A protein has these predicted regions:
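Extracytoplasmic gate region of multi-pass secondary transporters
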Residues: 25-30, 220-282, 337, 367
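Interfacial helix-cap and linker-helix signal at transmembrane-aqueous boundaries
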Residues: 32-33, 64-65, 148-160, 165, ...
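C-terminal transmembrane helical hairpin of 12-TM major facilitator-type secondary transporters
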Residues: 231, 241, 263-339
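Helix-loop-helix hairpin linking two adjacent transmembrane segments in secondary transporters
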Residues: 142-189
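C-terminal ends and interior cores of transmembrane alpha-helices
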Residues: 79-93, 301-313
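Helix-to-loop junctions at the C-terminal end of transmembrane segments
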Residues: 57-70, 279-290, 375
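Hydrophobic core of transmembrane alpha-helices in multi-pass small-molecule transporters
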Residues: 97-113, 317-331
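Intracellular juxtamembrane helix-capping segments at the cytosolic ends
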Residues: 32, 113-127, 134-135, 331-344
Length: 410
């Protein structure tokens, strides 16, 4: 049966709307601390382990996802993520940190990783002439999810309790992911004109020679290139700083600018809008100005943003700066698959993208825990935010060198 590529995009967004609820974790931070008697850093470990397993499972299962196809891998994601959410309800009921880390962190994280990479390479093949737009479309739902999940979690927690919040959402997420995954598949002959292969051949002809001498790299070949390591580092930096802010933005807003818990939950929802919008807007912009220059812009803006965030206590300015950082954070995710396809080709994109996502796993540990531990040690966030600004300076330099290298090679 012939399928519609816009419905394919809707199915991709459906999967990411579910698994992207991890970005609303900061709404649950204080309720989990109070319910289980944990410290801020102990609670943050659940989120960090989930992101670690997201990155590791995406890195090691990228080739597996390519082999079995998006429908089957989507169902695997549903099983792991749904089980993780329902098991988290049990962990909270029993007040067991070990079970919290096991279900939300390990099992939920594997569901996140498989679900995250499942639709990306599929949509690139359905939108071959607009690969940046396609990856932004696929990943957009992951960012937008907090808009729905943040207020929903706050409402469910206040009405039916923290345990039933995880139980109800786990069942809903399982059903939506399975339904969405059942529609996904690559385009068949004649369904997309021009095909991805034809688009790439045309682009190669216009360039007259590939900057990297090969049109398509395998995962192993890509990882032997210095460009892979440069991309990994700028991806790691953007995520470390952005995800550290995301994981703790609700308690941070309550402490720094004195938001109420309800206001902080609403702000998390707004962050979800900006996170999602940044993914689709920046990836589309990157189709016009190039992926390399887009990353240079990200880091230039974030150097300013993190420095100013460390010294401001004014509510409106705080909100604007956080939203700017989150916009760049989301855009960094959506531009990366297209940047990889520009440099390494698309034949093994899912596998290569998976290896880059290991940076997300490590950053998921580094960002939130550095921010949480230094907050407990110093009583504030200023030193960590200054550190993040410094990391952005290094990433800016690396992104510039990579961009200039790619331009000279054409």
């Amino acid at each position: 049966m012939k399928k519609n590529r816009w419905l394919m995009a809707l199915a991709a967004v459906g999967i990411h709307l579910c698994i992207g609820s991890v970005y609303a974790w900061s709404v649950l931070t204080k309720p989990v601390m109070n319910e289980m008697g944990l410290s801020l850093s102990e609670t943050t470990w659940a989120f960090s382990i989930a992101i670690l397993f997201l990155g590791m499972s995406a890195g090691f299962l990228g080739g597996f996802v390519e082999r079995i196809g998006p429908s089957y891998s989507g169902c695997i994601s549903a099983c792991f993520f749904g089980t993780g959410m329902i098991g988290t309800a049990l962990a909270i009921s029993w007040k067991s940190p070990f079970l919290l880390y096991l279900f939300y962190g390990c099992l939920g994280g594997i569901g996140l990783g498989t679900g995250y990479i499942t639709p990306v390479s599929v949509l690139v093949k359905w939108f071959p002439e607009h690969r940046g737009f396609a990856t932004g479309l696929a990943i957009m739902g992951f960012g937008f999810s907090a808009l729905i999940a943040g207020p929903a979690m706050q409402y469910l927690t206040s009405t039916v309790g923290l345990v039933y919040n995880f139980l109800i959402l786990g069942i809903i997420y399982f059903a939506v992911i399975v339904l969405s995954a059942s529609y996904l598949r690559p385009p068949r002959k004649g369904e997309v004109t021009p095909t991805l292969e034809e688009v790439l051949e045309k682009q190669m002809a216009l360039k007259k020679s590939s900057p990297h001498k090969k049109q398509s790299f395998t995962r192993k070949e890509a990882m032997h290139s210095w460009r892979w390591y440069a991309l990994w580092w700028i991806f790691f930096t953007n995520i470390t700083c952005g995800i550290g802010l995301l994981a703790l933005v609700s308690p941070m807003a309550q402490e720094v600018i004195h938001m109420t818990p309800a206001e902080a939950a609403s702000f998390v929802g707004i962050i979800g809008v900006v996170n999602g919008a940044g993914r689709i807007i920046w990836s589309t912009v990157s189709d016009w100005i190039g992926r390399g220059f887009t990353y240079i812009m990200f880091f230039a803006m974030e150097i300013f943003a993190f420095y100013r965030l460390s010294v401001t206590g004014e509510k409106l300015f705080f909100e604007i700066i956080v939203l700017l950082v989150i916009s760049c954070y989301g855009g960094g995710f959506s531009c990366m698959p297209a940047y990889l396809s520009d440099i390494f080709g698309v034949r093994h994109l899912a596998a290569i993208h998976g290896t880059i996502l290991t940076a997300w796993g490590i950053a998921g540990i580094a960002g939130p825990l550095v921010l949480a531990v230094m907050k407990e040690m110093t009583g504030g966030y200023e030193l960590t935010l200054d550190l993040f600004a410094g990391m952005m300076v290094l990433a800016f330099v690396i992104a510039t060198v990579l961009h200039l290298s790619n331009r000279k090679a054409v």
